[in-house]
Each structure stands twice: as C-alpha cells, then as structure tokens.
Amino acid sequence: RYIPYDQEDVKRQMVAAIGIEDKNTVTRANYYTLDLXIDTVTPDVNRNELKEK
C-alpha cells in the first residue's frame, strides 16, 4: 500500500535517525522501508561511502 508521506519531513526524520547529514542520499526506496518498519534504511555500500567522506 502507498502512504503519501510528507517527503521532506520523512527525510528529516531519517537523516536524524541514521545520522546522514546529506538528506539527498535518502531515496524513494527508503520511504517504502519505513512503511515496512525496517530499521536499516541505507545499503551498506552507501553507508561505507559516507564514512569515507
């Protein structure tokens, strides 16, 4: 099912939750993981790339 999230608000919450400063790394796919209640919203590859910056 589709839930019309307030995308900017969702981005802010996810950025705070997973400690990513660049909100642009939050993708549409991540919105669906929120609805599924999955805590891990960022693939390990992206997480490693962010650590290197």
Swiss-Prot record:
A GO biological process of this protein is: proteolysis
Q: Name one GO cellular component term.
A: extracellular region
Keyword match Oxidoreductase: no
Q: What controls its activity?
A: Alborhagin-induced platelet aggregation, but not shape change, is inhibited by EDTA, suggesting that the platelet activation (shape change) is independent of divalent cation or metalloproteinase activity.
- Where found? Secreted
Name the needed cofactors. Zn(2+)
What's its EC? Answer: 3.4.24.-
- Recite the UniProt cofactor note for this protein: Binds 1 zinc ion per subunit.
State whether it acts alone or in a complex, and with which partners, per the record: Monomer.
Function per UniProt: Disintegrin alborhagin-C: 42 kDa fragment of alborhagin autoproteolysed that does not show platelet activation.
Q: Which family does it belong to?
A: Belongs to the venom metalloproteinase (M12B) family. P-III subfamily. P-IIIb sub-subfamily.
Q: What is this protein's record name?
A: Zinc metalloproteinase-disintegrin-like alborhagin
Q: What organism, scientifically named, is this protein from?
A: Trimeresurus albolabris (White-lipped pit viper)
